Amino acid sequence: MANEFLFTSESVSEGHPDKVADQISDGVLDAILAEDPKARVACETLVSTGLVVISGEITTSAHPNYREIAQDVVRRIGYDNSDIGFDYKSCAVLAAINRQSSDIAQGVNEGEGLDLDQGAGDQGLMFGYATNETPSLMPLPIYYAHRIMQRQAEVRKDGRLPWLRPDAKSQLTVKYVDGKPVAIDTVVVSTQHNPEVSHAQISEAVIEEIIKPVLPKELMQGEVRYLINPTGRFVIGGPHGDCGLTGRKIIVDTYGGAAHHGGGAFSGKDPSKVDRSAAYAGRYVAKNVVAAGLADKCEVQVAYAIGVAKPVSLMVNTFGTGKIADDKIVDLIRAHFDLRPKAIIQTLDLLRPIYSRTAAYGHFGRDEPEFTWEQTDKASALRAAAGL
C-alpha cells in the first residue's frame, strides 16, 4: 500500500520585515568584507516603523557607513514612499556597535588559544541536506515557494503588476507518494498591495502572473487549491506592519522544514562563525553525496566546540535511501572533506562580499556563482571511492 502524505514549506519576500533586517545585516557584512576580509562581524538589525537599529559585535579596520548601507538596502527592496509605511529617504538609522570579545577572539584567531589552528567561533550543531527530488537537489516545496516569491518581486519591479507592494509570503503544500512529490495540493500567497485594487483582481493576477509561470505543470494536473490574500486585505505591511529582526526566518533560509536545523541564523555573521560556514559546508557535503548517487536523500550533522578546529561529531542519515551504509558514507566524508573552519573558508572562498545575495530567497539551491557550496565537484571522486 502506497504511503501518502502532504508536506508544506513557506517562503517570504525580500520586503518581509525579517528579510529586510537580514539584508541590512548582510549588507553591513559585505561592506566590511570588501575592505577587510579578516574582519569579525556579528551584526543584528531591527526594523520598525520609520526606524532601523543596527547593533552587534564588529572588529574591523573598515569604516562602514551604516546609514548609507541600510538606506541602500531599503531603497533596492522598494520601500521608497511614506505612503507604504516605510521610506529609505526618511527612516532613522541608529547604530550601536561593540568589538568582538577578546575571550572569543583568542579561541578563533589562528596561533592563539589552546588550539593553535583557527578554532570554531562558537559551539553548536549544524545540518546540511540534499534530496534528488529536484534538479537543484533541494526539497521541492521550499524550492518552489522561493520561486513564487522571486516572481512576485520580478513582476512588481518591472511594472507588470504595479499595485504590488514589497511585503509578501508564499506557502506550498505538496502531495508525496512513497517519498516522491507527485502533485501540488495547495498554494497560499499573501501579498501587500495598493488599497485601490480589488481582491478579485489580486487573486486572478497572482494566480496567472506569479504562481502558474513558475510551478511545474506536471504537478498541477489535478485540482489545486489557491488561497490568495485569504484575510481579504493586505495594505499595511513591511516594517510598518510588523517589527523585523535578523535571524527569524531560519527555516525559510534552509530546507523549509524538510531537514533538521541546529538553531543558528546566518545573516550578519562572518564565516568564522560556524553557524553559517559549517551549515554551508554541510549542504556542500550532502549535495555531493546525493550527486554522486550514494543516496537519494542525505542529511549531515556536524558539531563544534568553541576554540577547537576539528568537529566534535559528524553524523549522516540517508533515510534508508543509501546505496552503501551510512557509516561508510561518514568515512568517505572524512576522507574527502576538511570540516575545520579555516579549511571550509578556503574551500568555499567565503572571505568575499557575497552574502547580500543569500539574504533573501534561500541560502541553498541557487546557481549563482557566489553560492560555491552548491558545487558538486566532489561527486565523481565520492562515487569512485564508494565503488559504484
Curated annotation (Swiss-Prot):
Binds 2 divalent ions per subunit. The keyword ATP-binding applies. Its EC number is 2.5.1.6. Its cofactor is Mg(2+); K(+). ATP binds at residues 16, 167-169, 233-234, 242, 248-249, 265, 269. Its main location: cytoplasm. Residues 100-110 are annotated as: Flexible loop. Pathway: Amino-acid biosynthesis; S-adenosyl-L-methionine biosynthesis; S-adenosyl-L-methionine from L-methionine: step 1/1. Keywords: ATP-binding, Cytoplasm, Magnesium, Metal-binding, Nucleotide-binding, One-carbon metabolism, Potassium, Transferase. L-methionine binds at residues 57, 100, 242, 273. It catalyses: L-methionine + ATP + H2O = S-adenosyl-L-methionine + phosphate + diphosphate. GO terms for biological process: one-carbon metabolic process; S-adenosylmethionine biosynthetic process. It comes from the Bacteria. K(+) binds at residue 44. One of its GO terms (cellular component) is cytoplasm. Mg(2+) binds at residue 18. The keyword Cytoplasm applies. GO terms for molecular function: ATP binding; magnesium ion binding; methionine adenosyltransferase activity. It is found in: Cytoplasm. Catalyzes the formation of S-adenosylmethionine (AdoMet) from methionine and ATP. The overall synthetic reaction is composed of two sequential steps, AdoMet formation and the subsequent tripolyphosphate hydrolysis which occurs prior to release of AdoMet from the enzyme. Belongs to the AdoMet synthase family. Homotetramer; dimer of dimers. This is S-adenosylmethionine synthase. It comes from Azoarcus sp. (strain BH72). The lineage of its organism: Bacteria, Pseudomonadati, Pseudomonadota, Betaproteobacteria, Rhodocyclales.
